[in-house]
Amino acid sequence: MANAGVNETVAVAVAIDAPGVGHDHGAAGEVRRPSTRRLAPAGSGGRLMAELLGVFNGLTERMGEDVATSSSSRLLFRALKLALPALRDGGGDGGGGQSVSRALVVAASLADLQMDAEVISAGMVRGALDTGALAMADVEAQLGASAAGLVEESLKVKRAPSEVDVADEEAASALRKRCLSSYDIRAVILELAVKLDAMKHLDVLPKHQQRTTSLEVLKVFALLAHAVGAGELSLELEDLSFQRLYPQAYAHIDQWLSSQEDDCKRVIAASKEELLRALTADDELRCTVTGVDVMGRYKSRFSTMKKLVKDGRRPEDVNDILGMRVILDPRPGGGGGGDGDGGDRACLRTHEVIKAMWKDVPARTKDYITRPKGNGYRSLHVAVDMSEPGPEGKKRPLMEIQVRTREMDMAAVGGQASHALYKGGLTDPEEAKRLKAIMLAAAEVAAQHLRDEPAGDGGQTTAAASAATAGNVERAFQLLDKNGDGRISMEELTEIMEDLGAGGHDAEELMRLLDANSDGSLSSDEFALFQKRVKLKTKLENKDDEYKEILKQKLQKVDDTGLIHVYRKNLSDKLVLV
């Protein structure tokens, strides 16, 4: 009946000697990283077939019986046959093997989000299209017009942030609304999975592009993930962006959470086993469910920073460092599925078992099952005190336990859009309209937490401020354009660099970086873009310094109870991440 596990995304990987899916099981609370096992060499026919079948089996198992129909299986198989050779032969960053591995990670993420075969197939070939290894005509011919249309729409979502200044909140808000209202939601979710993979491979990009991409993710894509209800995907996108944009602040948060990690892991591991035994031994619960999963939860660095810096909490008031999740499988015909009375009763009974085991904190109990959130989220959140008894006992943060059914969890993890797709929805225009309205509202609520992030014009939105900025850029350009022909030539740039103590090689490298149209000179528009990058870099560094000082003051106060322990190490060699 019981099955204790960890609720983390596992990358699809293929062993050389045997097909299958690589499951990277780690300690509770750790983020699962994709397996890096080498794929079969192109010349080995038997191994290639093993690779194809292994990936196919792994993906269809993730999709579940209700999604992996015979027609969807055929589509997925065609996508694999199309994508794997193209990616391996086409190469890309890190070679063909890495391109294949990344495509499989994207496909696995989409399968975990309960996307249908069209979306997963589109995700499989997106990487090959991005690298030019496949043409859109190939995709349409092999996978059909619908899958090709999803790929095209996902590319539009990808390009959308480049059309606006995402650092400007009004522009970012309008862009989020456009993505949610104008594009197929499945294409948005496809781009979110691709973006998550891209954020894990940012080191191949120039530093300025790393910052630009991270800001786009923080201001647009993480909020889109929240809007469609993919909360865990949103948290991971936020954390990856946070690490790149504010490396010093991230280091302080990571250091503090890591200092408590060993004790937290021990507590979570012991508590998981204890709770699992209690739930599987409970006769009343056994009558209503067929299975129970208990798992540890990952603690977001970005959400911790928001609580400490933006909400003004003290470190000892951040109570959800410890976390578990209980997922229940209600018995068929026991009053309904995850939304039925049987599932609801099982969740409430689990709450009773938890209260009998540990000291709960009623004021922090949140019943989103009886009273769901506006976006449809349903779960029971319970807080319990895990401190050791007695005056000499070790004090610990509260443990938050989330209790939900399998169907509730799928809706929470995959989002309302994927849940509706899974249930056969989004075919009714009114239902699709209602879901989009919910998503638009959710995106705006989430955006409230980011109001003080760097703005494109320093927070000013007036025409005068924009004109002043443009004037400064124009004056600087005129000073560098010594012959006044409206362009900065290679000779002029070299002279400037030599005046600054650099050489001709540095001038050539800078020209390659800034010369967007590769005509050998810099136009005023290209120079303005460079100025914009410099301005954004300065603002991010200033904000990082501000966050760092706030966190330094809060987190370097050692609590007498032993709750807060901060290692006073020199982190200067670890902070240059952007």
Curated annotation (Swiss-Prot):
Listed PANTHER family: GTP DIPHOSPHOKINASE CRSH, CHLOROPLASTIC-RELATED, GUANOSINE-3',5'-BIS DIPHOSPHATE 3'-PYROPHOSPHOHYDROLASE
Domain statement: The calcium-binding sites of the 2 EF-hand domains are required for enzyme activity.
EC number: 2.7.6.5
PROSITE patterns in the cross-refs: EF_HAND_1, EF_HAND_2, HD
Expression sites (tissue/organ): Expressed in roots and shoots.
Protein name from the UniProt record: GTP diphosphokinase CRSH3, chloroplastic
SUPFAM superfamilies xrefs: EF-hand, HD-domain/PDEase-like, Nucleotidyltransferase
Sequence positions that bind Ca(2+) 2: D515, N517, D519, S521, E526
Chain sites annotated for binding Ca(2+) 1: D481, N483, D485, R487, E492
Keyword terms: ATP-binding, Calcium, Chloroplast, GTP-binding, Kinase, Metal-binding, Nucleotide-binding, Plastid, Repeat, Stress response, Transferase, Transit peptide
Domain of life: Eukaryota
Transit peptide residue numbers: 1-45
Modulation of this protein's activity: Activated by calcium.
Family indicated by similarity: Belongs to the RelA/SpoT family.
Enzyme class: transferase
Domain EF-hand: 468-503, 506-537
Record organism: Oryza sativa subsp. japonica (Rice)
Biological processes per GO annotation: guanosine tetraphosphate metabolic process
Described purpose of this protein according to its UniProt entry: Possesses calcium-dependent ppGpp (guanosine 3'-diphosphate 5'-diphosphate) synthetase activity in vitro and is able to functionally complement E.coli relA mutants. May be involved in a rapid plant ppGpp-mediated response to pathogens and other stresses.
Gene3D superfamilies hit by this protein: Beta Polymerase, domain 2 (3.30.460.10), EF-hand (1.10.238.10), Hypothetical protein af1432 (1.10.3210.10)
